[in-house]
């Protein structure tokens, strides 16, 4: 029997929470967990070079199947030698299934058992995405970690609808597993859905765990529900995933949500948040968010974050970065993007150390107090 493409190794459990320290072994290298994954939607993390991402400690990045299918097309990427060669990234890559993007086109799509009919958001042409097609595209892209095609229903959808949805997602997951051409080179994750309904999350997890995926994602969160709701769902969903498999919380990137996810046993996170807010001149700092384009920073010659040792904070001032952003200079966006990504990657590095030292709850409390978060969102341990 061949070795699975990806393997999770548990290194240490936190004594006081559900947090765990581990590593994920993939065909393109091993990365430590818990880990935040920068998002490179179109085979690039906006304005960042691969060298800069490595420099700041990004052990794995995410690319988007839907967008790469539309442009430049999976066949072209395959011809280039796969996504790693195409974008000159020699470390692990995770691709999503395209499902979230298709389902967010709510006024332009129709769901059937076979798959989803929708209109291309670029030119309005009719397209069809099935579980098999989503896997086929990802096989051609050559990512290390692939996602099953799933439906992501709105968090406030009715119980009856969500029940039908998770049952269909389970059938789609089974079809995707059968269609997967490279299980020895690419690991496929199942995605647990169920909105805020505990029994439906349990059913979804049970179905998927019975299929023995090498890893599992928790989907359908960070879609507008409160932090308390998200934590409530994680409290009963994460334990449903086997301990020997990686657990990935999709679309989460706020610092407090990362820490609270880790406390509940999550290993992997991704989000466009750090680069998206960076393009608007908003920076993550140890004191909370800083909107550097605001007038109060015009003559502020301090770094973005005086406690940060990233390249940006060692070399540039708030005043200079504000000037660049106010003048629509791309370099300003590069600087804020670099800093925000570094901030989250460094946060996760510190979280991993806190798990190693068995003081994650103390770390969380100190971080939240300095950042200004409401600690009431936390579960008591």
UniProtKB/Swiss-Prot annotation:
Q: Where is the active site?
A: 96 (proton acceptor), 270 (nucleophile)
Supply the EC number(s). 2.4.2.29
Q: Which GO terms describe its molecular function?
A: metal ion binding; tRNA-guanosine(34) queuine transglycosylase activity
- State the protein's purpose: Catalyzes the base-exchange of a guanine (G) residue with the queuine precursor 7-aminomethyl-7-deazaguanine (PreQ1) at position 34 (anticodon wobble position) in tRNAs with GU(N) anticodons (tRNA-Asp, -Asn, -His and -Tyr). Catalysis occurs through a double-displacement mechanism. The nucleophile active site attacks the C1' of nucleotide 34 to detach the guanine base from the RNA, forming a covalent enzyme-RNA intermediate. The proton acceptor active site deprotonates the incoming PreQ1, allowing a nucleophilic attack on the C1' of the ribose to form the product.
Q: Which InterPro entries match?
A: ArchSynthase1/Queuine_TRR (IPR050076), TGT (IPR004803), TGT-like_sf (IPR036511), tRNA_ribo_trans-like (IPR002616)
Pathway assigned in UniProt: tRNA modification; tRNA-queuosine biosynthesis
Q: Does the keyword Glycosyltransferase apply?
A: yes
Spell out the disulfide connections.
none
SUPFAM superfamilies from the entry? tRNA-guanine transglycosylase
Q: Which UniProt keywords apply?
A: Glycosyltransferase, Metal-binding, Queuosine biosynthesis, Transferase, tRNA processing, Zinc
- Assembly information from the UniProt record: Homodimer. Within each dimer, one monomer is responsible for RNA recognition and catalysis, while the other monomer binds to the replacement base PreQ1.
Which reaction is this enzyme known to catalyze? Answer: 7-aminomethyl-7-carbaguanine + guanosine(34) in tRNA = 7-aminomethyl-7-carbaguanosine(34) in tRNA + guanine
**Cofactor(s) this protein requires:** Zn(2+)
What is its EC class?
A: transferase
Q: Which residues bind Zn(2+)?
A: 308, 310, 313, 339
Gene3D superfamilies listed in its UniProt record: Queuine tRNA-ribosyltransferase-like
Positions bound to substrate: 96-100, 150, 193, 220
GO aspect biological process, one term: tRNA wobble guanine modification
Q: What is this protein called?
A: Queuine tRNA-ribosyltransferase
**According to the record, how does the cofactor bind?**
Binds 1 zinc ion per subunit.
Where do the record's region annotations for RNA binding lie? 251-257, 275-279
Give a Gene Ontology cellular component term annotated to this protein.
cytosol
Similarity-based family: Belongs to the queuine tRNA-ribosyltransferase family.
């Amino acid at each position: 029997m061949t070795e699975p493409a990806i393997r999770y190794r548990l290194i240490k459990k936190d004594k006081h929470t559900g947090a765990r320290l581990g590593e994920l072994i993939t065909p393109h290298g091993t990365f430590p967990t818990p880990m935040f994954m920068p998002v490179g939607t179109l085979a690039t993390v906006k304005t960042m070079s691969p060298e800069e991402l490595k420099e700041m400690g990004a052990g794995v990045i995410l690319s988007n199947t839907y967008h790469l299918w539309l442009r430049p097309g999976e066949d072209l990427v395959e011809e280039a030698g796969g996504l790693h060669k195409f974008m000159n990234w020699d470390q692990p890559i995770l691709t999503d299934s395209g499902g979230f993007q298709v389902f967010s086109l709510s006024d332009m799509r129709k769901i059937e058992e076979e798959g989803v009919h929708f209109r291309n958001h670029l030119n309005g042409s009719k397209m069809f995405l099935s579980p098999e097609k989503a896997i086929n595209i990802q096989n051609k892209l050559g990512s290390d970690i692939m996602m099953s095609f799933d439906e992501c229903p709105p968090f406030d959808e009715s119980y009856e609808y969500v029940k039908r949805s998770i049952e269909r997602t389970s059938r789609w997951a089974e079809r995707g597993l059968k269609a997967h051409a490279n299980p020895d080179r690419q690991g496929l994750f199942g995605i647990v859905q169920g909105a805020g309904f505990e029994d439906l999350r349990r059913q979804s997890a049970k179905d998927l765990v019975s299929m023995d995926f090498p890893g599992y994602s928790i989907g359908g969160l960070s879609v507008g529900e409160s932090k308390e709701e998200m934590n409530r769902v994680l409290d009963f969903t994460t334990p449903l995933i086997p301990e020997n498999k990686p657990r990935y919380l999709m679309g989460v990137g706020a610092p407090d949500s990362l820490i609270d996810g880790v406390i509940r046993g999550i290993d992997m996170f991704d989000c466009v948040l750090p680069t998206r807010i960076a393009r608007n001149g908003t920076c993550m700092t140890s004191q909370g968010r800083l909107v550097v384009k605001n007038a109060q920073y015009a003559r502020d010659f301090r770094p973005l974050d005086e406690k940060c040792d990233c390249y940006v904070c060692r070399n540039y001032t708030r005043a200079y970065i504000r000037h660049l952003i106010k003048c629509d200079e791309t370099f300003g966006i590069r600087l804020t993007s670099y800093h925000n990504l570094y901030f989250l990657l460094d946060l996760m590095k510190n979280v991993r150390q806190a798990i190693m030292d068995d003081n994650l709850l103390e770390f969380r409390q100190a971080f939240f107090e300095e950042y200004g978060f409401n600690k009431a969102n936390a579960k008591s341990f």
